[in-house]
Amino acid sequence: YKVRGQERGMDAQKAMSVYRIVQESLNNVIRHAEAKHAWVELDFTDSEVFVQIRDDGKGFVVPANPAEFPEKGHFGLLGLQERAEIINAELKILSTTGQGTIITLQVR
C-alpha cells in the first residue's frame, strides 16, 4: 500500500465506510479476480481523501448503471456503491477483461 499527503481524521461513519469499501474490494480481488497483485493507495489533501484499489486480475465488464450490478451477480459492487452514497463520496469502477480492475473512491 502507499499513503501520500498528511493523514487526517474523519468522522466515524465515513472512516468505517471507507474501511468497509477497501475491505470488500480486496475480498473481491481474492474471490474473483485471479490476480497476482493488488495495490491500495490513499492520497490525503486538505479537503479530500482519494482511495484507489487496483489489481492485475482477469477483469470484467462493468455494467453501465450500478442498478444492474445485482442482475450481473455483482452484489458486492452494489454494496460498495451504496456505502459510498451514504457518505456522499464518489465511487468509480473501471475494469477491462484480461487487464484487471481499478476502484477509486473520492471522499470529501
Regions found by a protein language model. Give the residues of each.
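Coiled-coil dimerization/phosphotransfer module
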Residues: 1-108
